[in-house]
């Protein structure tokens, strides 16, 4: 069976059960992962980084974790420029530190009206579009890993 393009699929049906909303949201995430997959080479890299991080947390490694980044990431080019610069620093300190770029895609202090970040509104000039925001967020994270080899915290 051929799946319709992502934009043509119907995702949200409003019911009064939280369980249905959770299942629908889960399906959206699975579909986005299928439509925008992480290439096998990046999956391997992510697994290696996750293992290094786990070793620090469990005390198997003497390195320190440093999660570093801006309050909110809402411009893909700027974020990737920042992560590229951080990757250069990472090369200098990788024997003692594991640098994890923070790519936070919400605006944590924005409530009510206003721009809430790329995940809610990928284009600040247009209406909010959560699905497009999830896609933009995934693309930004994949690009950052591809360009730098650094996996991020969100």
Predicted stretch roles:
Residues 96-154:
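Active-site-facing alpha/beta catalytic cores
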